[in-house]
């Protein structure tokens, strides 16, 4: 763009005009830099339950790991060793990338992120989570956040009192107690809107965050209508926060109420997969590749709308063998 033209008349005029020109050039450089954004495609779920990229509309598929350094025992263990947690995150994310992972999932320990009313706490756990997200973004690793666990932070040690709302309720009453539901609404609303200081983006606006799962392995004890009402209240709180990302729900627990899950507006469903079992108590021998050839879901042909939801395995582990080939 042709901005200006000037003719030198005196040394003073020349210096003045040169200064003005310099300011104009700097201004346009600054504006150009600030206005430049890297377009990162987001994820949407089509009418057939397939995750797709927003730019190419091709299917999006992911393989990754759970990793919990910001929370609970992993957090404490690094403290015992005197290890800088952010330095550990730097190294671990590097190795996750070397493994070829393009995805990361975590269930947040809400007991370490909230007060007794469900208000989000600005603390070291949240700061480390924000830092971890920023480092994952640098490696082009996409993220699914499971917002809450609704159990303590102790295992394999004793729980530590934190004042978090989940400590006030039994896990199986979390989804029916009015005060507990209100606390979860408050927490989800604040979490989704939380701005990560390392990225400058709210979780709801970060394209590297694929979506949110409402909770980890819920324990529903009520009727199907009560289960549906609970999920709809959580969805409403997340929408109110401005979220447009897909929301997932665990459908591999409480299978007797599975119809209620699919009768809500969740966009994705989550499952465990231990292809050769979990508790044999010994190392099993043999060729187990046929066990990962298929993943059969018992209610796949029984529930209306099953094929309209995306599917995510949040735990995959051939736990009773010592071989790596199952991956």
Indicate where each model-derived feature is located.
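Aromatic- and carboxylate-lined catalytic core of secreted/periplasmic carbohydrate-active enzymes
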Residues: 327
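Short, Lys/Arg-enriched N-terminal segments with co-localized hydrophobic residues
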Residues: 1-14
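Solvent-exposed loop/turn segments connecting transmembrane beta-strands
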Residues: 322-324
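Boundary at the C-terminal end of the N-terminal hydrophobic targeting segment
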Residues: 33-37
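Glycoside hydrolase catalytic-domain groove-lining segments
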Residues: 240, 244-320
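Bacterial N-terminal signal peptides
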Residues: 22-29
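Active-site mouth of glycoside hydrolases
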Residues: 40-266
């Amino acid at each position: 763009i042709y901005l200006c033209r000037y003719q030198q008349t005196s040394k003073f005029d020349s210096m003045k005009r040169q200064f003005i020109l310099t300011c104009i050039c700097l201004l346009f450089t600054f504006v150009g830099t600030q206005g430049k954004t890297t377009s990162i495609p987001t994820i949407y779920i089509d009418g057939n339950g397939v995750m797709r990229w927003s730019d190419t509309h091709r299917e999006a598929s992911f393989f990754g790991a759970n990793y919990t350094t910001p929370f609970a025992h992993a957090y404490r263990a690094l403290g015992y060793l005197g290890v800088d947690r952010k330095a550990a995150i730097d190294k671990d994310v590097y190795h996750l990338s070397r493994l070829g992972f393009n995805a990361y999932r975590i269930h947040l320990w809400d007991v370490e992120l909230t007060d007794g009313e469900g208000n989000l706490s600005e603390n070291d756990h949240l700061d480390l989570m924000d830092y971890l997200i920023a480092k994952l973004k640098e490696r082009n690793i996409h993220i699914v956040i499971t917002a809450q666990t609704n159990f303590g932070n102790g295992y394999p040690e004793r729980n530590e009192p934190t004042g978090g709302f989940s400590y006030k309720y039994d896990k199986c009453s979390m989804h029916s107690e009015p005060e507990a539901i209100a606390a979860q609404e408050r927490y989800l609303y604040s979490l989704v809107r939380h701005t990560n200081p390392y990225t400058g983006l709210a979780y709801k606006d970060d394209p590297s965050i694929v979506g949110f799962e409402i909770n980890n392995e819920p324990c529903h004890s009520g009727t199907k209508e009560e289960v549906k009402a609970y999920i709809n209240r959580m969805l409403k709180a997340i929408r109110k926060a401005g979220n447009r990302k897909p929301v997932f729900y665990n459908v591999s627990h409480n299978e007797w109420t599975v119809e209620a899950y699919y009768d809500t507006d969740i966009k994705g469903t989550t499952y465990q997969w231990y292809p050769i079992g979990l508790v044999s108590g010994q190392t099993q021998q043999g060729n187990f590749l046929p066990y990962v050839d298929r993943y059969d879901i018992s209610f796949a042909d029984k529930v209306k709308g099953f094929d309209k939801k995306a599917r995510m395995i949040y735990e995959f582990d051939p736990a009773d063998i010592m071989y790596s080939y199952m991956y």
